[in-house]
């Protein structure tokens, strides 16, 4: 039974979000780590993400039955009752929000609330099923964890937080479209209006390319703004160029499914690399940096 309650929280998604939380937290800490704050932030975000995932599993249990990838999920198979999943999700959420409020700061908690509401209330309940723009809206919730980590330290939403929001939101788009391409039949069967299904894979490839270019620009802003160093800059540039090259090769791909899966895998490598580099190659912002004038 414990295994089922763990599975319904989507541990893989929690782990991926924790990497970005750590990146944002350590970027803001700049070598001076408040370990109790670090622990409260990690556990708090983990619980909120887990809660969102359980609510998502509850909401999506009808369409999950139609998709090969999700047909064996805990709620679909009836291993946990829908009522118990709602209670479980609610308790996880309350615990997570309380930890962020008392262990971090109110700003971190409210950012978590906004991310949660967007993911569960806007994306899962409506946009995912009714709009081709669901992925775009959902990307905002996916970008919340690193911003929460950052603001847990700074206790303010500054330019650095805005750049992180842009980086991780833009990253979500090609990442999600790649999944939709190599899982095309699943989304089609479940009648989910993702871009590749609604507009076609060729249109999705154009969007992927444009979003990766925008992502590349956003990643450089951390260094240009004086938040991250040149080692981060080199890695960010290299990762972006390689990812863009993979996207461009998609126009000549003989097998879109294989190409999209490779693009998806590298997207994880890309965002993990950036999270690690911003954790170790941070800088104290100069009051006369470039973004002072831009923003």
Swiss-Prot record:
The chain crosses the membrane at residues 8-28, 35-55, 74-94, 106-125, 132-152, 162-182, 208-228, 233-253, 264-284. One of its GO terms (molecular function) is protoheme IX farnesyltransferase activity. The keyword Cell membrane applies. Its main location: membrane. The keyword Cell inner membrane applies. GO terms for cellular component: plasma membrane. Belongs to the UbiA prenyltransferase family. Protoheme IX farnesyltransferase subfamily. This is Protoheme IX farnesyltransferase. It comes from Cronobacter sakazakii (strain ATCC BAA-894) (Enterobacter sakazakii). The gene is cyoE.
């Amino acid at each position: 039974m414990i295994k089922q309650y763990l599975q319904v929280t989507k541990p893989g998604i929690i782990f991926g979000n924790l990497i970005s939380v750590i990146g944002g937290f350590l970027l803001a800490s700049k070598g001076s780590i408040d370990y109790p704050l670090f622990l409260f932030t990690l556990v708090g975000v983990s619980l909120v993400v887990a809660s969102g995932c359980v609510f998502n599993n509850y909401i999506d249990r009808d369409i999950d039955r139609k998709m090969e990838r999700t047909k064996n999920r805990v709620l679909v198979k009836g291993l946990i009752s829908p009522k118990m999943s709602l209670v479980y999700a609610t308790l996880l959420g309350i615990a997570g929000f309380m930890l962020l409020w008392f262990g971090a700061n109110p700003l971190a908690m409210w950012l978590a609330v906004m991310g949660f509401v967007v993911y569960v209330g806007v994306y899962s309940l409506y946009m995912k099923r009714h709009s081709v723009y669901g992925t775009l809206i959902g990307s905002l919730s996916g970008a919340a964890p690193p911003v929460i980590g950052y603001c847990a330290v700074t206790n303010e939403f500054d330019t650095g937080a805005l750049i992180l929001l842009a980086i991780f939101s833009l990253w979500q788009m090609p990442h999600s479209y790649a999944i939709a391409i190599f899982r095309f039949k699943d989304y089609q069967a479940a009648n989910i209006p993702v871009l590749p299904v609604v507009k076609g894979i060729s249109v999705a490839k154009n969007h992927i390319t444009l979003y990766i270019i925008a992502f590349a620009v956003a990643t450089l802003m951390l260094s240009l703004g004086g938040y991250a160093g040149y080692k981060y800059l080199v890695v960010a540039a290299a990762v972006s160029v390689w990812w863009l090259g993979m996207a461009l090769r998609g126009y000549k791909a003989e097998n879109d499914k294989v190409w999209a899966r490779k693009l998806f895998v590298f997207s994880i490598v890309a965002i993990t690399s950036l999270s690690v580099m911003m954790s170790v190659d941070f800088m104290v912002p100069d009051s006369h940096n470039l973004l002072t004038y831009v923003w």
